[in-house]
Amino acid sequence: MIYNEKLYNSLLSMEEKFNDLNKELETEGLSVKRMSEINKSIKETTPIVEKFKEYKRTLNDIDSAEKLIKSEKDNEIIELAQLELSEKKPLIEKYEYELKVLLLPKDPNDDKNVIVEMRPAAGGDESSIFVGDLFSAYKRYADSLGWKVKMLEVQESSHGYGFISFMINGENVYSKMKFESGVHRVQRVPATESKGRVHTSTITVAVLPELEEVELVINNSDLKIDTYRASGAGGQHINKTESAVRITHIPTGIFVACQEGKSQIENRETAMKMLRAKLWEKKEEENRKNISDLRKGQVGTGERAEKIRTYNYPQNRVTDHRINLTLNKLDNVMLGNLSEIIDSLISHDEAVKMQEAKI
């Protein structure tokens, strides 16, 4: 029995192509280019084919159990078959959902590392303080997933931070962190507030994918590169060498700076990564402006001006406005336990894409 014939036939066709590609890979005299294309297709399709095999096995088990119930006269065997049915049938819906997710068009940046920029917005000192608080939550979240955080630039203010930028390296980082772009609002009583009044402040977060040189080519003639002495902690060495680097992209006026590395070469390489990410962001913003009919149900636009989440300290509540998700455990979230929020955003985004794709 096939529960979803359209899905089944689509997967069957994909499996046949997958098998054909594996056979072609064994062909003698295959060009390096074609071999690379085949290996890429096989890598992308393997998770779908493996899941489809599980799906087919479950369908066959259900079919066998149903036939056994109809033909068997031994009550004990019938009961065992009915038990198997009760265990296997719920798996069909689960596998079909997982297969639909695997069939969705992939964001080409999902497997990339990210560059994150955090800035205070409205709210003065409280805003600057919350930049540090949310950064700590991101750092713990990254640590919990085995990701590595590398500081790029830190600007301290009198009571917090005027700017923090950092890179996160790991598996599929952008697929999760991209949902953090936007305006984060915090509501709490400042330490200096004598009357216990709740103040509201905001910070902005931008999450950019780290791009390879071949993905976004920058002409050296378009760059103005300055070096200067790094500031901040680091002892005498920092003041003796011009290890900090500032790169300006002349055509756009976009500039980046990096001083956290140990050498000028390291800072220059990092600054170029930052610049590629910023130029990508500019291009994406232009694309969004040119598209008149953005999909209405998407999980936010990713624009910095969009208020995405509120952190209410007096009520220990965090609300993500894009999916109307409220959790009454802000203290836990700020310890880096962001998975429940981010996973919910991913699930919502997948559901919307499925509806649009009519899968």
Swiss-Prot record:
Modified residue annotations for N5-methylglutamine: 236
Record-linked InterPro entries: PCRF (IPR005139), Pep_chain_release_fac_I (IPR000352), Pep_chain_release_fac_I_sf (IPR045853), Prokaryotic/Mito_RF (IPR050057), RF-1 (IPR004373)
Organism annotation: Malacoplasma penetrans (strain HF-2)
Major location (coarse): cytoplasm
Role played: Peptide chain release factor 1 directs the termination of translation in response to the peptide chain termination codons UAG and UAA.
Protein name from the UniProt record: Peptide chain release factor 1
PROSITE patterns documented for this protein: RF_PROK_I
Keyword check for Transport: no
Alphabetical keyword list: Cytoplasm, Methylation, Protein biosynthesis
Family indicated by similarity: Belongs to the prokaryotic/mitochondrial release factor family.
HAMAP family with a match to the protein in the record: Rel_fac_1 (MF_00093)
Post-translational modification (record): Methylated by PrmC. Methylation increases the termination efficiency of RF1.
Keyword Secreted appears in the UniProt entry: no
